[in-house]
Amino acid sequence: PIMTLGHFGGSTGDAALVEVLFSAGMLAGSGILAATGGFRNKSLTMVAAIAGFGVVAIASGLLGPSLFAVFLPASFLMGACSPLYAGTQTALMQEQIPPEYLGRVFGLYGTIMAWAMPMGLAAPSVFADLLGAPLWFVGSGATMVLLAMAMLLAPSVRNVGKRDTGRIQ
């Protein structure tokens, strides 16, 4: 909403449309993941999703105020990247963690995510209010691309997603 209302000068209806398109993208990304299973190496699916989201976020941040119509499909694409990462990460955890620990690991993971979410929403709001939403999109997108590159360069990350690897002992 900050990008739509502030940078593009849109209405609350425009902000709702962006959210609907992001959600539709999530459904499409989920369908793609369900139909294909992602790349053979699951970690590459996660890397591609992070990099894809980052590239589209950078492009969105560079859009001029009159290019709201371009932001709409970009929102769809960012939404499509989300389940490609999250769904693949969940599948990797289920494959790699011994069943007797899986419930505890998912419980801890859920707790950490629930704790981090308010902070993850508050920090960007403050940043966007101070420096503008476009700069936040560019900065966070660049960070995501760098993270994806670091993941791709790390042998431990590249190898964990291979279908022929065993469980973590």
Q: Where is each model-derived feature located?
A:
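C-terminal transmembrane bundle of multi-pass solute transporters/carriers
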Residues: 1-169
